[in-house]
Amino acid sequence: MLNVVIIGASGYAGAELALLVHKHPELNLKGLYVSAGSQDANKPFSALHPQCLGLVDLPVKPLDEAGMLEAKTGTDLVCLATAHEVSMNLAPQFLDAGIPVFDLSGAFRVQQDGFYDKYYGFTHDQPEWLAKAVYGLAEWNAEQIKKTDLVAVAGCYPTASLLALKPLMEAGLIKADTTPIINAVSGVSGAGRKAAIGTSFCEVSLNPYGVFNHRHQPEISYHLGGKVVFQPHLGNFVRGILATIYVQLADGVTAEQIDAAYQQAYSHSPIVRLSKQWPSIRSVAGTPFCDLHWQMQDGLLIVGSAIDNLLKGASSQALQCINLRFGFAPTTGLM
């Protein structure tokens, strides 16, 4: 079995990943860590996440000097569920020790000059590792994932959006010089576990945010290979993403061509489900699936895409990438 360390285990995505690793027949959850100054350090993991009581009762250790040495010793792979700049600094320390890294943050997703200064507020000082990172969208980058030691797990909104749009782009079905519009809503868990007024029970509603400046818009455009308009919304539910995407089709595109594009992309993918009805968050919450459905009329295509933001949008996608990298069946530990 492979020994796995998770850093950033106190957050929602880290908790989901710990459960997935615990259930995986080929993985052993060796250690859970948080930053040295975290108030969660030295607490039982199940005290932070009661749903894990009796399943994952390991202590959450501080990643101080001794913790880092322990985290590197006898470890086969590391998962980072940490803040973006923290991941940028931590990943090379493990990679230089020969330990593959699966990073759930945005620190290594986009290889574009000035991107991190503009959208993340810091200068990326690991250009060599950034250039080597493989984007962890499992259904589209499987062969590259198998050969890399640094996987930048795709973001939650980008996963829902790209799985819907890439088959159309690859098949040349999107009208030239037009811009797909992505209207997406996410549950409040996407904002993380840290308390904030805007995500408190009494305050949360349904509202747009990040208008024209959300960092996932350029991530989507970069990995799609074309411009998009992306507008996220915060919903008054815990988990899940529902994206409704509007696409102008190239002249003469038929329903048969659209169906063929999606079938070619996903007929052998058990994680992406081509549904006969419009997807809902209820259908995917707590699962690793992405549900897709589409309808066309008068040259306009509308695609619905639903995922669990903490699973397919984060932890279960990371596990898919781990399965690919280490030669396990793609759905091991997921289905």
From Swiss-Prot:
The active site is at residue 156. The keyword Acyltransferase does not apply. It is found in: Cytoplasm. It is an enzyme of class 1 (oxidoreductase). The keyword NADP applies. GO terms for cellular component: cytoplasm. Disulfide bonds: none annotated. GO terms for molecular function: N-acetyl-gamma-glutamyl-phosphate reductase activity; NAD binding; NADP+ binding. One of its GO terms (biological process) is L-arginine biosynthetic process. Keywords: Amino-acid biosynthesis, Arginine biosynthesis, Cytoplasm, NADP, Oxidoreductase. Pathway: Amino-acid biosynthesis; L-arginine biosynthesis; N(2)-acetyl-L-ornithine from L-glutamate: step 3/4. CDD domains: AGPR_1_C, AGPR_1_N. It catalyses: N-acetyl-L-glutamate 5-semialdehyde + phosphate + NADP(+) = N-acetyl-L-glutamyl 5-phosphate + NADPH + H(+). Belongs to the NAGSA dehydrogenase family. Type 1 subfamily. This is N-acetyl-gamma-glutamyl-phosphate reductase. It comes from Tolumonas auensis (strain DSM 9187 / NBRC 110442 / TA 4). The gene is argC.
